[in-house]
Amino acid sequence: MMIMKHDYEIDTFGLSCPVPIMKVAEEFKNIPEGSVLKVVASDEGIVEDLRSYCKKTNHEFLSYEISLPEYIVYVRK
């Protein structure tokens, strides 16, 4: 399991789409530009959903890891 340095973390475990993406969007309003956000989720769609979200919003999708039942995604604002 890779551990990436991150500045902030949100736990969306147990929440279904589109709630995790909404939580990320809300968190991005409150953190400084350049910050790395770690997103912990149980929804298997989170990786592709966040990849697409980052592309549309000019944020950077950094990496992800899967350690079932958790999906962990790192994105930069």
Q: What is the role of each PLM region?
A:
Residues T12, A41, V75-K77:
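Hydrophobic residues in beta-strands and at strand termini
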Residues K23, E27-H59:
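Amphipathic, hydrophobic secondary-structure cores in small proteins
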Residues M2-I31:
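An N-terminal amphipathic alpha-helical segment
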Residues D7-E9, V36-K38, E70-I72:
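Intrinsic-disorder/low-complexity, polar/charged segments enriched in Ser/Thr/Lys/Arg/Asp/Glu/Gln
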Residues R51-K77:
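C-terminal structural segments of small proteins and small subunits
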